[in-house]
């Protein structure tokens, strides 16, 4: 899932994970589906890396072998399995949480910025691991190269609307550019029509017949739509300034 900062990508992941409430709508989940969520700022139930790994692994229907657990930790730069989490940096804690996510047996893996705090070798290893994964993966990432190599579909979140892009990042850029041009053209046509109807209203309606009333109603709809467009434009500008 891609989109500019502040559009609600992380919030949507939390909603899908059942961590955050949503205002309206319905989420339909397959019965028995197992979902695991990797947040940007993880929290743990124990203070020891290995204890946390063992706790997660004990809940798996088919526990992961010990050597594989240690291999995943090592690949992510965690070589002291008895490390105390409270003494770790934020980056180390995020890598431990990523290891926990990869060790968890689930149908859907939700990842929020999984490549943060990873070096190039770790990112390359993670790419190969996720490509081989049997779980469906839904992630938020700003790493376009990682995205290109791992993801098969992109969902763009823009002003509360979702747009699906099948293909790589270049396809997304092309699709978005086309959509923006179409929106500009539609907005230009709407603006011209609004100006024309505004002139008619200001000139005064000579007869209050059915046609005039219909035209007034259409003008009101145009006015409301134009107000909404201006409001959305202000929201976008405010987000960009932040």
Question: Which stretches of residues belong to each language-model region?
Answer:
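Flexible nucleotide-interacting loop at or near the entrance of a catalytic core
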Residues: 60-62, 178-242
């Amino acid at each position: 899932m891609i989109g500019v900062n502040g559009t609600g990508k992380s919030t949507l992941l939390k909603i899908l994970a059942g961590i955050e409430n949503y205002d309206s709508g319905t989420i339909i989940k397959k019965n028995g589906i197992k979902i695991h969520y990797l947040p940007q700022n993880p929290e743990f139930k124990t203070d020891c890396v290995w204890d946390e790994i063992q706790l997660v692994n004990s809940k798996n229907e088919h526990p992961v072998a010990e050597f594989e657990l240690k291999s995943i930790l090592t690949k992510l730069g965690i070589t002291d399995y008895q490390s105390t989490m409270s003494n770790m940096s934020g980056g180390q804690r995020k890598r431990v949480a990523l290891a926990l996510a990869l060790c968890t047996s689930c149908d859907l893996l939700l990842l929020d910025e999984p490549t943060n705090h990873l070096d190039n070798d770790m990112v390359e290893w993670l790419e190969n691991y996720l490509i081989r994964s049997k779980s469906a993966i839904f992630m938020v990432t700003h790493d376009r190269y990682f995205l290109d190599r791992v993801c098969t579909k992109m969902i763009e979140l823009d002003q509360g609307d979702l747009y699906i892009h099948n293909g790589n990042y270049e396809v997304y850029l092309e699709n978005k550019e086309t959509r923006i041009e179409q929106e500009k053209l539609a907005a230009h046509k709407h603006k011209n029509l609004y100006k024309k109807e505004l002139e008619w209203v200001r000139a005064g309606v000579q007869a209050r017949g059915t046609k005039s009333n219909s035209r007034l109603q259409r003008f009101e709809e145009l006015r409301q739509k134009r107000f909404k467009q201006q409001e959305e434009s202000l929201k976008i500008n405010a987000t960009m300034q932040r």
